[in-house]
Amino acid sequence: MKPWQKAVRYCAIAFAVILIANIVGWALGLLGLIFVSPETAISDEPQSFEFSAEIKDLEIEIPSARLTLKAGDCKVITVKSNLKNLTAKENGGRLKIKDPTKGKRQLDSAFVEIIYPSGSVFKKVDIDSGAGRLEIVSLSCASFDLDLGAGETVIDSLTVSELADIDGGAGALNMKNVDICGIDLDMGIGELTFSGKLSGKSEISLGVGEARFELEGSKNDYSLDLEKGIGDVKVDGTSVGNSEIGDGDTRIEIDGGVGNIVIDFKGANE
């Protein structure tokens, strides 16, 4: 594909994504006004659930609320929320947390907080987050599946031993202190900041917004396959085009979108 054709393609993608996001946001807002209001969706007294720390799988589906997952000094898994219709049920080692309310607009004061014992290692964590801020602090699991909607996402201290699958939405994604054995990341609209360690094979498809990577280790540890979109690409301070760089054991394929890409390395042997 010729450069001008790629430029047209990515501009069209950016316009389409923005248009769809606006239409969906308008439609959800209208449905929210028709079907539910904050007064009926939120309780004055938050509810709390407790579950055994032996839970191995987390399945979370929250259409519209501030969602927080974090490790704490506790012996059980606690779920707290002021959403009236939130359900939290355990079955066969799987904890399913869901707000079934349909057609709900974004509720700025709504929250869901999930606290698990420090040192917990889950087998699978599956999160479907709609409108609202998502924050994850100190989470370890074998498999991580994240489907984002609209809002900022902050992840601090994430360890994934098998594969992380992340579908971006509309909003910034900030990941730091992470250790992931292979990531399949498909960004939407928003800035991406990634700081930590990758191993195995990763595929990253960028959308609309700047992307910054600070990879643990030296450049020799990685094998980069870069296809730039619209914007500059810098690897270790050097501007590059479509290229393959390095022959390290960790392979990362990056398909650029609309926005600059910066890749730096941190480690003793930079």
In which residue ranges do the predicted regions lie?
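N-terminal Lys/Arg-rich, disordered targeting/topogenic segments
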Residues: 1-7
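N-terminal targeting/secretion presequences
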Residues: 2, 12-15, 145
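Hydrophobic membrane-insertion alpha-helices, especially the h-region
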Residues: 9-29
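Hydrophobic alpha-helical segments and their boundary regions
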Residues: 14-21, 54, 140, 198, ...
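Short linear S-[DN]-x-LW-Φ motif typified by the pepsin-like aspartic protease active-site region
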Residues: 29-100, 105-107, 111-128, 133-139, ...
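Short, surface-exposed interaction patches in beta-rich subdomains
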Residues: 153-158, 162-270
